Amino acid sequence: MEITDVRLRRVHTEGRMRAIASITMDHEFVVHDIRVIDGNNGLFVAMPSKRTPDGEFRDIAHPISSKTREKIQIAVINEYERVGEYEDAPNYEEAGAS
């Protein structure tokens, strides 16, 4: 499996979320709402999730292997850093509270 595209929307809010990404795998499957979070040990990727009735969060989609998780993390964070350097990049969109 290869990550063939990463789309990124930077988020400018007070919280730790820095961006929301969508990834395409093998030009055939897209996963939306992947979050880039600024954690205590640097940036990390959080998979899309929803809140259950009892208040817990459950992943909607997630990689099964650590190798695949690492591929996703590297691709998304690399795109986040690339877009940060070039605000006029074609995939750059700004999102967040006005």
Curated annotation (Swiss-Prot):
**The keyword Cell division belongs to this UniProt entry's keyword annotation:** yes
Which GO biological-process labels does this protein carry?
division septum assembly; sporulation resulting in formation of a cellular spore
Q: Which residues form a coiled coil?
A: none
Query: What is the gene name?
Result: spoVG
Entry function: Essential for sporulation. Interferes with or is a negative regulator of the pathway leading to asymmetric septation.
Record HAMAP family: SpoVG (MF_00819)
The alphabetical list of record keywords is: Cell cycle, Cell division, Septation, Sporulation
Protein family:
Belongs to the SpoVG family.
State if Membrane is listed as a keyword.
no
What name appears for this protein in its UniProt entry? Answer: Putative septation protein SpoVG
Q: Which SUPFAM superfamilies match?
A: SpoVG-like
